[in-house]
């Protein structure tokens, strides 16, 4: 009977230790590949396609709750203030 109680207590302690480790692992888990959920963006740049006094460049996208990861948005921007020509 003592052996059964010791076994149950040992199994209980081991299960607690394992559950604490998995919570830490889940807390530190990095998503495998978040980019397929992001909208498709234009990564190519061609200055010939931009209007006069505009340059083609890539700017980082803002971090929002919908897109919590940085991405690049390439396109035509105003030469002096780097504001996009068209808002998507």
Curated annotation (Swiss-Prot):
Contains 3 disulfide bonds. The keyword Repeat does not apply. One of its GO terms (cellular component) is extracellular region. It comes from the Eukaryota. Residues 1-22 form the signal peptide. The keyword Lipoprotein does not apply. GO terms for molecular function: toxin activity. It is found in: Secreted. Its main location: secreted. Expressed by the venom gland. Keywords: Disulfide bond, Secreted, Signal, Toxin. Belongs to the scoloptoxin-12 family. This is U-scoloptoxin(12)-Sm1a.
């Amino acid at each position: 009977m003592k052996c059964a109680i010791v076994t149950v207590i040992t199994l209980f302690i081991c299960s607690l230790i394992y559950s604490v480790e998995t919570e830490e692992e889940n807390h530190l888990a990095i998503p495998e590949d978040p980019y397929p959920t992001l909208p498709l963006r234009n990564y190519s740049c061609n200055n010939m396609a931009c209007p006069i006094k505009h340059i083609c460049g890539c700017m980082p996208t803002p971090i929002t709750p919908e897109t919590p990861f940085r991405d690049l948005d390439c396109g035509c921007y105003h030469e002096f203030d780097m504001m996009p020509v068209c808002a998507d």
